[in-house]
Regions:
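Zinc-dependent metalloendopeptidases
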Residues: 25-229
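Nucleotide phosphate-binding site architecture
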Residues: 232, 247-248
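Short, threonine-centered small-residue motifs that mark membrane-proximal processing/anchoring sites
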Residues: 11, 15-26, 223-241
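C-terminal membrane-anchoring or membrane-association module
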Residues: 248-264
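Generic hydrophobic alpha-helical membrane-span motif
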Residues: 154-155, 239, 249
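N-terminal leader/signal peptides at the extreme start of proteins
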Residues: 3, 227-228, 255-258
Length: 264
């Protein structure tokens, strides 16, 4: 059986234009992805550039609206600044893309560019190579993956990585059945954000930083084309497809920094 798992590839960073204070407890938070977060002196309004197909748009829109109910963060939907196939990053924004990226072994791939632990741009790729297949071409998998990758882009790690246990009612939870209707993972749906997810996200963002990108300040920008380009120094989470028997697994690896964002 093909299962989903996730690979974290952490690359060293050299870009030092943005230096921000990291919450003192970040390294202790179970749902913090290496302490990565968007630096903020107040609330965040993060532009979400739409580079996805019409098929993906309702799922991306729903996930953005759901994450935007958090008390610290709003995703601001904007026109995309790239193409689905290229999915180039734009400084100060998250660009979300869909395309047929081929047999890469991943369904969704989130890349963040950081200075220290402060995120200054991110991309999300949704791989139609797999979503055009019957197993994944359904509303539950599409919504769960879009929701989870957008959570990762905020610095939130996954809630659970075991595919065969009961769903916990969170898009950050791995499952063979995110719909909760097939009798394999209980009856809870894993397509939305749980109260626990919001609690963990709020723990990450409860402590203010000393700086904030002007592009992420509420009301500052609504056009990603006005944002300057950044230097690629990516760190990535990938939701991959692989055969690991009856158990999902998580792996961590390191790769050298390259001149372009990598896709595994």
């Amino acid at each position: 059986m093909k299962l989903l798992t996730k690979v974290a590839a952490h690359c060293g960073v050299a870009f030092a234009a943005l230096v921000a204070a990291v919450p003192a407890s970040a390294s202790l938070l179970p749902q913090s992805w290496n302490g990565y977060h968007w630096a903020h002196t107040g609330n965040l309004a993060i532009m979400l550039g739409n580079n996805v197909s019409a098929t993906w748009t309702p799922y991306v829109t729903a996930a953005a609206a759901a994450w935007s109910t958090d008390k610290y963060i709003d995703y601001i939907p904007t026109a995309g600044s790239t193409t689905g196939s290229t999915c180039a990053a734009m400084y100060g924004t998250v660009q979300i893309c869909s395309s047929n990226y081929g047999a890469t072994n991943w369904l969704g791939w989130t890349t963040v560019w950081t200075s220290g632990t402060s995120i200054y741009q991110a991309t999300i790729k949704l791989n139609d190579y797999y979503f055009n297949n019957a197993k994944y071409n359904n509303a539950a998998f599409r919504q769960q993956v879009a929701c989870q990758e957008m959570g990762n882009a905020l610095g939130l790690q996954d809630a659970d990585r075991i595919y065969t246990n009961l769903n916990i009612g969170s898009c950050m939870d791995y499952s063979n059945d995110p719909s909760g209707t097939k009798g394999t993972n209980g009856t809870l749906s894993n397509v939305g954000i749980s109260a626990t997810d919001f609690s963990h996200l709020d723990d990450i963002y409860a402590v203010l930083d000393t700086t904030q990108l002007i592009y992420t300040k509420p009301g500052a920008f609504t056009n990603p084309q006005s944002v300057a380009g950044g230097v690629p120094e990516p760190s990535s989470w990938a939701m991959i497809v692989g055969g690991f028997g009856a158990l999902g697994m998580a792996m961590r690896r390191r790769k050298p920094v390259t001149a372009v964002a990598f896709a595994g």
